[in-house]
Amino acid sequence: MLCIGMMAVTALVLQAQKPALDHSVYDDWKTLSRPSVPYDGPWMYYTVSPQQGDGVLHVVNALTGSEWSCPRASDFKISLDGTKAVYKIKPKYQETRQARIKKKKPDQMPKDTLAVLDLKTGAVEKYELLNALYVPFELADWVAYTKHVEKKDSLLKKEDLIVLNIKTLEQDTLKTVTGPVFNRTGRQIAYVCKPGAKDSLRRAGMCLYDAAAGVTDTLLFADKKAQLGKVYWNEAGDRFAFYANLDTAKTAAKQIDVYTWADGQVSKVLDHGHASIPEGWKLSDNPGLGWRFGDQALTVGLCPIPMEKDTTLVDFEQPQLDIWTCNEDYLQSVQKLRAGTEKNRTYLSLLRLGDGSLTRLADEDLPEVSVPLDFQGDKLLAWTDKPYRIRQQWDTDPCHDVYLVDLRDGSRTLVATAVPWTRISLSPDGGCYVFYDAVKRCWMAYMLADGRLTDLTSGLGVNFFDEKDDHPCLPPPTGGATWFKDSRHVALRDRYDIWVVDVTGKDKPYTMTEGRGRAEKTMYYVNLPYSRPQYFPRPTVIDPAQPVYFMTQNEVTKQGGVAVKDLSRRRSSLKSLVQGPYKWDALCISTAPKKPVLYYTRESFESGRNLYSTTDLSKEGTLVCETNPQIRDYNWGTVELMKWTRPDGIEADALVFKPEDFDPAKKYPVIFYFYEKDSQTMYSARNPAPSRSVVNIPWFVSNGYVVCDPDIYYKKDGHPGRDGLESVMAATDELCKNAWVDQAHMGIQGQSWGGYQVAYIITQTDRYAAAGAGAPVSNMTSAYGGIRWGSGIVRAVQYEQGQSRIGKDLWSGFDLYYDNSPLFFVPNVKTPVLIMSNDNDGAVPWWQGIEFFTALRRCGKQAWMLQYNREAHNLNGRWHSKDLSKRLDQFFGHFLKEEPMPEWMEKGIPATKKGLTLGY
């Protein structure tokens, strides 16, 4: 008994002695990639990467359990027969870092290496100085690559393509290659041979290399000045199409034609002078050529011939200005950001290879038309928001005109105007569209055969819109549509359950989840396991012959789970495989063993995100990878769900994070961090990491703080500031019922919308000893007409219908804009505040932070503002994030732990000392 007691005491002492996280731990904290299972073999692979440094890819055999590790691997691919793998080895992080410090030129920087891994023995063959790697979609025997050539007198040129047999390691070299493209099976490479001007031995042309035979065939000879474009293979890999301009005359420099190679022959299938190409228009090589209708047609792009620049004008004498007009679709700020896209915009046409006819499907009035890969019909729907683009400045609700486009002649029929259709999805057979009608708040089906429009969900007695949405606009649907393979049934999600609806109306709708979601207040989400990719990607469908998996989350407890239903059995019932205080994700199945092995990730705040395998999810899985075992070495933390009823009747939730060595007999400083609603993330893993904008919860908890993250509840009456205040104050009241809360040392922190709420709260109460406001809006009246420079759009829409939740324009709701603006109540502030407002913020105008700071300064308040140079809304530079982490630590440490005030807070950093000291 004495021994046991001493052991218990020792354990407690060891626990108490666990060190707190410090700012040096970030780089080694790792993330786990999604596991992947290629083809139908036994192999699974995943990558574990530190935040800064070199990651390791792990390849695991589901049959034998054997594992190979591949340091710094990327672009990893396993061969069809499962015997080899090909990948790039990136240079070591420190080597690249040192080269950057020494300011080496690009050609002197460390280079990638090509690696071929023998999955039987683990042996790796390496090929250094890799420039570019070309791997076929189905890796069988060959890959191709180019090298960085170091010596000018080398026989190998940088344009030379090396074809490598990964089984025999034999190589072949193809000279002066551009644009090589494997076909799907990896047996052939189509490429352009383009010798240099001084090379008199080789001719330019489109070539085809047969890897098995080692033979190159020049399919089309061309002048060295001719333009030969990228190759577009069909899915079978037995033909390809390409753009070319063989006319080297200057007058023809911008005209291209379309060619195909099929049945051993190259043919021009579309001439730039085709009668169906309107005057002033031309063929464009952007976005490319697409095979359709069983390889009997090609989608091609047309575009207006661009305006030529007047070269007689002197550049420096030309006015440089932007002209804003009220009748343009988009503001100049949007147009400038989209200028590159618009200059390259093309309009879809369909080329029938049988008769050479060209049908224009899209134009400037109906710019977005697409023909799905497997579509075999004559007509399809297309929609445009063009007539409603100006109103999108303030109206987020979906609005489109919908047309029925005839693929035979390009004619179009107006189906509906100004319709609020969204989440539009075409059935796999191309016969039916389903979409969500935001006004009717139901799912609809449109039959292409007869134009019949059917309401799919209004009569089901449940809502298919987000019942919790609290924005002043039409609520979005609770999810998208997932088609069944039969193109007749579609899966739709209400708040809790997954419904199966027959779009023909013959079968009665039913819940695939058997109503358990609503009965148990558990939300179900279809989670189809990772499946083999397709050469041309297609939407994922539900196959009734395969089990359907569901990720679940209980709305009350926030616990996650996994369920399954075997649709191949007539009387199959939903089976809950596992449920508990975790979040499950990333299902993938290796079907090579006799009993399929399922890989999945499981995570929680306490354990992190780890990888498991199992043949039976109802039993505890086998740990494949513990991503961050060092969690056990530090004073980590726990998370609890705090639930209570507010005085106004709202059933409220908040997450409460406590240190691992929490002692209820002690007093703890508290930081309230908030944004909107985060309680559903209770079981998400959280890594220590440099802050891009907000307090890092693991770090602060480990260092003796309690962190409370309350959900914010908005009442949709135009008072979001008050709603945030009431939500945070209510959570504070509830938490303060615990004697361990140090009520004299409580702080608040948030970023962006959270930063705004922090700014508002400190103008209404002095309850908090310190506040951190990242990228806050301080003056809604000036922010209303500001620009989100990252997208170019005006911010008005955010206030009238979006996150800022005012619900009115500035003039009809001026009192609301005034009442919700922290700037006008700055004289009330008593709380010291740290602001971050960066000068390249693309979301919140930088001057909003300046307005707030200068007002606080004018009113004699305690305030600091961090302005990271050339930084965005959330910090991108890791060195900046590390700096912010230290300053958040010191700021809250001073006011909530009574630690000494650092130099940067006491004296600032004068501009004359910028870059010389950080003032820590």
Model region roles, listed by residue range:
Residues 459-471, 618, 625-745, 749-751:
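Cap/lid segment of the alpha/beta-hydrolase catalytic domain
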Residues 687-920:
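Active-site-proximal cap/loop segments of hydrolase catalytic domains
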Residues 448-464, 505-519, 568-570, 580, ...:
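Active/binding-pocket-proximal capping segment
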Residues 16-598, 603-609, 902, 907-909:
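Beta-propeller folds
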Residues 385, 553-554, 603, 673-677, ...:
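Glycine-rich His-Gly loop
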Residues 612:
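Conserved glycine-bearing catalytic or ligand-binding loops at nucleotide- and phosphate-handling centers
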Residues 531-542, 634-649, 916:
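Surface beta-strand/loop "capping" patches
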Residues 1-19, 777, 786:
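Bacterial Sec-dependent N-terminal signal peptides
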